[in-house]
UniProtKB/Swiss-Prot annotation:
This is DnaJ homolog subfamily C member 5 homolog. Expressed in wide range of synaptic terminals: embryonic nervous system, larval neuromuscular junctions, adult visual system (neuropil of optic ganglia and terminal of R1-8 photoreceptors) and thoracic neuromuscular junctions. Also expressed in non-neuronal cells: follicle cells, spermatheca, testis and ejaculatory bulb. Low level of expression is found in many neuronal and non-neuronal tissues. GO terms for biological process: exocytosis; neuron cellular homeostasis; protein folding; regulation of neuromuscular synaptic transmission; synaptic vesicle exocytosis. Residues 146-162 have a biased composition (Basic and acidic residues). The gene is Csp. It comes from Drosophila melanogaster.
Length: 249
């Protein structure tokens, strides 16, 4: 009957049993713990009680209480989380005790339960990450503009006929034509001559040379036959205002 009670007391979260063993309050200082431990150790030492089994057990409990309460880190864990905190510190480390109790707190559990209910036990995450929308069957379409340039990195260098853009019977635009698909001839030779007139095409007419253009000097009003050597001003004097040419001073 004592073993279940001992296990239950060790895993308590109150943090009072070790202080009760030493007969001290939780506000006791380190010196008070040392003095009380020495008195109880001398009182229940096995050498003074050779045939007393209860005294031996009491001596073990006093030693355990002193080893925990004399360590400031373990004492803080015990004061906050009781014997259960000491057990968690032995399993996961003293630095992870606070994180363990935060994760297992009722508030965090309530948030997890609410998220599970809203998402249908995280069914949305499973469909997106694990099942990939039924092996890609219901996967959202990718950006369509990406497919327009997919032929640039194809391994065979040729595009199938169904990959060419359709323009309702019109010839493809220059920007839509793949330059790699243009045939340079039957033997692959480069083009060295201009294209000739095809049969049934429009006739070509030679245009006469342009006649000599006759202009008017804007400053003098005299007619001028303009050519490539004609200047805008036929006089050598630089004139900035036409009205001032005939002005007398």
């Amino acid at each position: 009957m004592s073993a279940p009670g001992m296990d239950k007391r060790k895993l308590s979260t109150s943090g009072d049993s070790l202080y009760e063993i030493l007969g001290l309050p939780k506000t006791a200082t380190g010196d008070d713990i040392k003095k009380t431990y020495r008195k109880l150790a001398l009182k229940y030492h096995p050498d003074k009680n050779p045939d007393n089994v209860d005294a031996a057990d009491k001596f073990k409990e006093v030693n355990r209480a002193h080893s925990i309460l004399s360590n400031q880190t373990k004492r803080n864990i015990y004061d906050n989380y009781g014997s259960l905190g000491l057990y968690i510190a032995e399993q996961f480390g003293e630095e992870n005790v606070n994180a363990y109790f935060v994760v297992t707190s009722p508030a965090v559990k309530a948030v997890v339960i609410c998220c599970a209910v809203i998402t249908g036990c995280c069914c949305c995450c499973c469909c997106c990450c694990c099942c990939n929308f039924c092996c890609g069957k219901f996967k959202p379409p990718v950006n369509e503009s990406h497919d327009q340039y997919s032929h640039l990195n194809r391994p065979d260098g040729n595009r199938e006929g169904n990959d060419m853009p359709t323009h309702l019977g019109q010839p493809p635009r220059l920007e839509d034509v793949d330059l790699d698909d243009v045939n340079l001839g039957a033997g692959g030779a480069p083009v060295t001559s201009q294209p000739r007139e095809q049969a049934g095409g429009q006739p070509v007419f030679a245009m006469p040379p342009p006649s000599g253009a006759v202009g008017v000097n804007p400053f003098t009003g005299a007619p001028v036959a303009a050519n490539e050597n004609t200047s805008l001003n036929t006089t050598e004097q630089t004139t900035y205002t036409p009205d001032m040419v005939n002005q007398k001073y």
